[in-house]
Each structure stands twice: as C-alpha cells, then as structure tokens.
Amino acid sequence: MKKLLKSALLSAAFAGSVGSLQALPVGNPSDPSLLIDGTIWEGAAGDPCDPCATWCDAISLRAGFYGDYVFDRILKIDAPKTFSMGAKPTGSATANYTTAVDRPNPAYNKHLYDAEWFTNAGFIALNIWDRFDVFCTLGASNGYVKGNSAAFNLVGLFGVKGTSVNANELPNVSLSNGVIELYTDTTFAWSVGARGALWECGCATLGAEFQYAQSKPKVEELNVICNVSQFSLNKPKGYKGVAFPLPTDAGVVTAAGTKSATINYHEWQVGASLSYRLNSLVPYIGVQWSRATFDADNIRIAQPKLPTAILNLTAWNPSLLGSATAVSSSDQFSDFMQIVSCQINKFKSRKACGVTVGATLVDADKWSLTAEARLINERAAHISGQFRF
C-alpha cells in the first residue's frame, strides 16, 4: 500500500510538471507540521493534552515569499440575455435610431480567449500545535484579458440619416469581427486563509484549506482591434451606470462625468489534498473548488472622438460604401461608424473544480520550498519559500 501511494504521488507530480499549468494555490497539506524547528528560536513540540503545556509551546510563526502565476484562467461573461440599443438596420435606406429596443446580447455566456493573473507577495502564517495554520499574504497583482469584441459589447451607429449626429441617436450595430484586450496596472493584493493537517498515518497526511483573495487594479491599457473601428487608450475612463445614448462629449478628452476603469477581483477557494513524505521531499496531490469574479461595474468606454468634425469625420474610422459608388451628400455621417463604445462586462469562472499537484523540499526542518501546478479550471503555477522563526 505504501509503495502504491508513493508511486501515485510521484506520478502525479511528474505529470503536473510536464502538463499544462493552472485560482489560488492549494498548498501542501503537511505544511503546518513540516517545519518543527525554528531558525531563531528552537521549536517546542507541545502536546495539547499535556496539562503543563502553554500557549508558548503551541504557537509559532512562519514567513516567506508567495508567487502565484495564472497563465490562462478559464472565464466567461456574466451578462443578461438582452442588451438595450438601437434597432438593427435593414435595407439600403438611411434612418434615425432614437428608440431603444431589447436585442439578444452577443456577450451572454461568451467565453474569453485568454485571462492571466500574476501575484507576488509576502507570506506569514500563525501555526497552532504544528497542525493548523492561519495565514495571510500581502503583495501586488496585475492581469491581462483578451476576448472577442462581442464579449465586450462593442457597438456603433451606422447608416444614420441627416447632416449631423443628434444627441439622442443610439448605436445600432454590434461589432463581433474584432478583438479587445486589456492590461491592468500593478496594484495591492491580499489574501487570507487557513490550512490544517486533519489526519496523519505514518508518512501520509490528509489536509484541507480555505482561502479568500482580493485586489482592485485599474485598467492600464485598452486595445480595440476591429476593421471598422480601431483604437487604443491608456488609463481609459468611461461611464458607470449610464444607459445609451452616452453624453455627446463621450470620447472627447475633456468629457465630464467619466470614471477610471477599475476591476474588482474576488476569489473564494476550498481544497483538500494528500501528501506523502519521502525524506526531504514531500509530494502531494489535491482537488480544489474556486469561484473568481472580475467586476468593472459594466463601465462603458467610448472611442476617442474629435471635438468637431474634420472632413465629415467625427472619429478616425474608415468609410464603408458597400455597393454605393459615391458618398451621400445629404447623409454626411452615414458611411462610417459613429459613437463607438465598448463595455467591460463582469467575468466569472467557467469551471469551478480543478486538480493540483506539487511537491515541497524541506531543509533541516527550518526552511521549505514548494512548487505547484493547477489544472482543469485554469493553467497556473505557484512557488513559495518559507522559514520558521
């Protein structure tokens, strides 16, 4: 049985190291009991059933580095089934689009192409009886998200009638033939959690953990890549809780009422894992359930706009004549995309359950180094080093 358990754990660790990497690290279930001697103070093996034991024997501190690198979080859009905008254009005649209608939301349940999240932090743990840890991390995170333009509700107005774009005109075209990507700045991040070695039998340990993490970065760069409307914004600002039509100065540098695009990241996780100690090496395998959300309050960000029309252009978008042979003289703004905007919808986990494999290297029962890979619900790697005081 022992040989079988050793083989299973070593095989899992090897498979995780060469397979695809993936929420929050599960960690080694043996962590609370691996470092039994202190670097500064000598460790005390306290027995909770000993009437002479004191809290000084029961409590110890560990500290170290915590690095978590999510290369591809599997996310989807959390948006309603309908989206309010102008009616879909039909035929060849221009028109005014001033009445809102509920249309099928192209962002509903849309999957993102890529989502990355990187965290570097300091780690401190309060250990009780060499069995339970209560820990926190303080550090910094930054991220990257990429998806189809439909996932960000990229919309615009095309085929508008008249010699001006009225303030009550609504976008009438959903643009799904593009890609939108955003980069966040590096900002403060923190997490708290608990981990316990619940059952031990010889060199095997079964444990469980719980964690919560939070960060609130701002969008540093927004790139919209679409053949009819392409733009890039540094530190973009937009409108929160504002329905269409957007203000007439939307997209102008001096626009009023805009707010910074900020993403509120939350994540909960519970996990269980099994480890087996082989001298200084402690491989482990585990499962975790996590739920992550990235919420930007559905902020709407407008394409940069010229304060006044230049050569009948309100933005630097290409003309789309289609089968027409000349630009209309009566409908001056009908042949290129107007009042383009995108919306940063709420993202959430598409898959909740994942598998974790990893190993811890222990030195003199005072120092340890852990490497971990997470699979299925994300591709991520984790590395941490810690010592006991």
From Swiss-Prot:
Pfam families: Chlam_OMP. Keywords: Cell outer membrane, Cell shape, Disulfide bond, Ion transport, Membrane, Porin, Signal, Transmembrane, Transmembrane beta strand, Transport. InterPro entries: Major_OMP_Chlamydia. It is found in: Cell outer membrane. The keyword Cell membrane does not apply. GO terms for molecular function: porin activity; structural molecule activity. It comes from the Bacteria. One of its GO terms (cellular component) is cell outer membrane. Its main location: membrane. One of its GO terms (biological process) is monoatomic ion transport. Residues 1-23 form the signal peptide. It is a multi-pass membrane protein. Part of a disulfide cross-linked outer membrane complex (COMC) composed of the major outer membrane porin (MOMP), the small cysteine-rich protein (OmcA) and the large cysteine-rich periplasmic protein (OmcB). Belongs to the chlamydial porin (CP) (TC 1.B.2) family. In elementary bodies (EBs, the infectious stage, which is able to survive outside the host cell) provides the structural integrity of the outer envelope through disulfide cross-links with the small cysteine-rich protein and the large cysteine-rich periplasmic protein. It has been described in publications as the Sarkosyl-insoluble COMC (Chlamydia outer membrane complex), and serves as the functional equivalent of peptidoglycan. This is Major outer membrane porin. The lineage of its organism: Bacteria, Pseudomonadati, Chlamydiota, Chlamydiia, Chlamydiales.
